[in-house]
Amino acid sequence: MTYVFPETIAAQATPSGRGGIGVVRVSGEKTKAIAQKILGCVPKPRYATFVKFRDSGSVIDEGIALYFPKPNSFTGEDVLELHGHGGPVVMDRLLNTVLKAGARQARPGEFSERAFLNNKIDLAQAEAVADLINASSEQAARSAMRSLQGEFSKRIHQLVDALIQLRMYIEASIDFPEEEIDFLADERIKETLENLTHQVQEIEKTAKQGALLREGITVVIAGEPNVGKSSLLNLLSGQETAIVTDIAGTTRDIIRESIHIDGLPIHVVDTAGLRLTEDVVEKEGVRRTQKAVQQADLLLLMIDASKPTEDFKKIIAQWFSENDNKIPTLIVENKIDLIGEAPRKENKEYPHIKLSVKTRAGVELLKNHLKNTAGFEATHENNFIARRRHCDAIARASAFLKNANNHLLNQKAGELVAEDLKLAQNALSEITGEFTSDDLLGKIFSEFCIGK
């Protein structure tokens, strides 16, 4: 069944700016009437038709029109796409003509929202549309495409169906107590519940990988002036992002650069050198450094390996006495080329990596540590893209299933087991949108671009 929305919507579906082609998309009950006004006809469904786009008889542009009648369209409504020349003036005139003919400007994500409400895609697939557009690596794009094609949703639906079947079986033992069968003592219930718990734990691991592909981790490089922080940023990013000189205090502000290591997005933050200073600008840089550190997933505390050992022990002790030591920290001992040491990793109170940014010795050790800290598996080919809300929902489902196991094995409490299964089912159904609040839907679709 197609949901009938009272308003027809329109938006430019291609990015703003100059381009060879620009597309205006229309969806809703007035689509055919709008086509008749602007094109003088309703194009043959699913055929590219070359036409002139007119406003009150005056030709605005000429190009290709594509018409998709309901319900076999992206939104499930009548959809019209007008492909014209991609100049901003032309696109503005064409969109304004469509709006004047009876449509209104679409909100961000409103086309995808209508597709979801008309059961053309589920919520996880709708989110995958945005994730595919925003993918920052080839691996993220492939994973988003798998989600868009429904692989993630299929696994969630299979789990939900299995939970429903098990819950029905357990509820039967509650509703028909006169039957002389102890359903809860049935070994198959125990095995099924254990199997479902394991499956949810496995999909939780995969979802975490998908969330890492989408969001990555934030790594902050901090330390005293002139220890090689900016040089490390330049080395990791592969370009001269930060100015590097022998003068202490060159970096006075936060410098951010996004890189990829085997598909893992890493947001690297280079910071001002930490030292006592009377310079007002440098003081502000130090303050921003301390703020950036609090938002880090991993801190790289850089020190100069060529200095006496007691000096950098004092630096490390002072740092952790003044800052939150709950943030995962790696001590990076740079400039080992000056003292003739080989690169290596040491696991002390805090892990240490000895390297030389100048010679690149030990840099692979650092990259591997970044991936391991994030829990990233670069060779995981069956990843789907995931969001934090997906991970949260799966984690809640996993917790409910653990409760169900406890209630089954230790208390033989059928009612509690059934309730745990229902809660796990609802948590998983939030992912595909079958059990979702309107507030969450509004938040999700508001993050889309206009025209999608």
Curated annotation (Swiss-Prot):
Write down a Pfam family by its short name.
Answer: MnmE_helical
Q: Which residues bind GTP?
A: 226-231, 245-251, 270-273
Any idea which positions bind (6S)-5-formyl-5,6,7,8-tetrahydrofolate?
R25, E81, K120, K452
Tell me one GO molecular function of this protein: metal ion binding
- State its Enzyme Commission number(s): 3.6.-.-
GO CC aspect terms: cytoplasm; cytosol
Enumerate the residues binding K(+). N226, T245, I247, T250
Is this entry keyworded Transmembrane helix?
no
Instruction: Output the InterPro entries linked to this UniProt entry.
Output: G_TrmE, GTP-bd, GTP-bd_TrmE_N, GTPase_MnmE, MnmE_dom2, MnmE_helical, P-loop_NTPase, Small_GTP-bd
Question: Where in the numbering of this chain does the TrmE-type G domain appear?
Answer: 216-375
Q: List the disulfide bonds.
A: none
Q: What class of enzyme is it?
A: hydrolase
Task: Name what cofactor the protein needs.
Answer: K(+)
CC cofactor note: Binds 1 potassium ion per subunit.
GO biological process entries = tRNA methylation; tRNA wobble uridine modification
Q: Taxonomically, which superkingdom? A: Bacteria
First-listed, main subcellular location of the protein, grouped into a coarse class: cytoplasm
Primary role = Exhibits a very high intrinsic GTPase hydrolysis rate. Involved in the addition of a carboxymethylaminomethyl (cmnm) group at the wobble position (U34) of certain tRNAs, forming tRNA-cmnm(5)s(2)U34.
Per the record, the similarity remark reads: Belongs to the TRAFAC class TrmE-Era-EngA-EngB-Septin-like GTPase superfamily. TrmE GTPase family.
User: What do we know about how this protein assembles, alone or with others?
Assistant: Homodimer. Heterotetramer of two MnmE and two MnmG subunits.
Question: What is the designated name of this protein?
Answer: tRNA modification GTPase MnmE
Give the organism, scientific name: Coxiella burnetii (strain RSA 493 / Nine Mile phase I)
Protein encoded by which gene:
mnmE
